[in-house]
């Protein structure tokens, strides 16, 4: 009798696996149809709570842009955890650390002056508001961009590279391509940060994900077509355009929680796009909705 039940369970497991594989294949076909004729390279990865993975253009190295602020945050929190540093610890910022020619709500609040701020606030500026100056201050605090790159690799994440700060990425159009990731490497990092206990202080993990949920940028991307109350913790990225009108990247990556509590992780990267900003966001939003519907 026991062998019979084991056989039945195995059969149902196999059937469920086949059904999920078919769903992923159908989803990939729908993405193909959506992208037909689009002047952009699009990469997608989805990792479900059952371990199913969708990979679309996963061989491509996509420039991360501000999505890398998630990587930075993990390294900063790792240092804080190991040194028992509180989120409410105060750091001193020099006016010289706040260059003017970059996106920085923090600089608008403290123009041309020295000031103090808590690490909590600094990380909220970097993640939720995607402040470039806050990000570079945190990179320095964590030990530099190479240290952050090495730390993420130690989490068993490969197929990515970080070598540029925000200031470095602004040095040339080519520099933005040096911070890159495959879509699947991004969702692996998201899942690692969510499911593993990277920090002994649970408050740090809770803070990170709440800050991701509080993200103010890119509401028209992953969240754009999802039901209004869907919980999404995400980090966006966006570049300028070159003289030919090509946009290096429009990105969004994060965690989506379904109404029944199940989760999935998704990265949507749009690279070298001649589509409008609205079209880029619409591509991400429509794919996000396709995934959401397939997961329910």
Swiss-Prot record:
Q: Which UniProt keywords apply?
A: Antibiotic resistance, Hydrolase, Signal
List GO molecular-function terms, semicolon-separated: beta-lactamase activity
Catalysis: reaction(s):
a beta-lactam + H2O = a substituted beta-amino acid
Q: Where is the signal peptide?
A: 1-21
Keyword Nucleotide-binding found: no
Domain of life of the organism encoding this protein: Bacteria
Q: Which leading EC class covers this enzyme?
A: hydrolase
Q: Which SUPFAM superfamilies match?
A: beta-lactamase/transpeptidase-like
User: Which InterPro entries does the UniProt entry name for this protein?
Assistant: Beta-lactam/transpept-like (IPR012338), Beta-lactam_cat (IPR045155), Beta-lactam_class-A (IPR000871), Beta-lactam_class-A_AS (IPR023650)
Could you state one GO biological process linked to this protein?
beta-lactam antibiotic catabolic process
- Binding residues annotated for substrate, in chain numbering: 235-237
Keyword Signal in annotation? yes
**Active site positions:** 66 (acyl-ester intermediate)
Q: Read off the Gene3D superfamilies from this record.
A: DD-peptidase/beta-lactamase superfamily
EC number annotated for this UniProt entry: 3.5.2.6
Family of the protein in this entry: Belongs to the class-A beta-lactamase family.
Other known facts = The class A beta-lactamase family has a specific amino-acid numbering system, sometimes called Ambler or ABL numbering and often misspelt as Amber. A multiple sequence alignment was used to derive a consensus sequence and then the consensus was numbered taking into account insertions and deletions. This allows use of identical numbers, e.g. for active site residues, despite differences in protein length. UniProt always uses natural numbering of residues, hence there appear to be differences in numbering between this entry and some papers.
The name on file for this protein is Beta-lactamase
């Amino acid at each position: 009798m026991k062998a019979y039940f084991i056989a039945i369970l195995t059969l149902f497991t196999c059937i469920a696996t086949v059904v999920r594989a078919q769903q992923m294949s159908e989803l990939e076909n729908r993405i193909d149809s959506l992208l037909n004729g689009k002047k952009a390279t699009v990469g997608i990865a989805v990792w479900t709570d059952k371990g199913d993975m969708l990979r679309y253009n996963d061989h491509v190295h996509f420039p991360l842009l501000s999505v890398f602020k998630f990587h930075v945050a993990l390294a900063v929190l790792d240092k804080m955890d190991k040194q028992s540093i509180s989120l409410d610890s105060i750091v001193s910022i020099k006016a010289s650390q706040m260059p003017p020619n970059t996106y920085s709500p923090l600089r608008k609040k403290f123009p041309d002056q020295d000031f103090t701020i808590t690490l909590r606030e600094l990380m909220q500026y970097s993640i939720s508001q995607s402040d470039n100056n806050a990000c570079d201050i945190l990179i320095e605090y964590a030990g530099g961009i190479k240290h952050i790159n090495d730390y993420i690799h130690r989490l068993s994440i490969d197929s990515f590279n970080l070598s540029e700060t925000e200031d470095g990425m602004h040095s040339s159009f080519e520099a933005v391509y040096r911070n890159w990731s495959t879509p699947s490497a991004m969702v692996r990092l998201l899942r690692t940060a969510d499911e593993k206990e990277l920090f002994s202080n649970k408050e740090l993990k809770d803070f990170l994900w709440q800050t991701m949920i509080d993200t103010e940028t890119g509401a028209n991307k992953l969240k754009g077509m999802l039901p209004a109350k869907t919980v999404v913790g995400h980090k966006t990225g966006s570049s300028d355009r070159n003289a030919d009108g090509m946009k290096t990247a429009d990105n969004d990556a994060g965690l989506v929680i379904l109404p029944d509590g199940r989760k999935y992780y998704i990265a949507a990267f749009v690279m070298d796009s001649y589509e409008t900003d609205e079209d880029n966001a619409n591509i991400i939003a429509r794919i996000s909705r396709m995934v959401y519907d397939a997961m329910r």
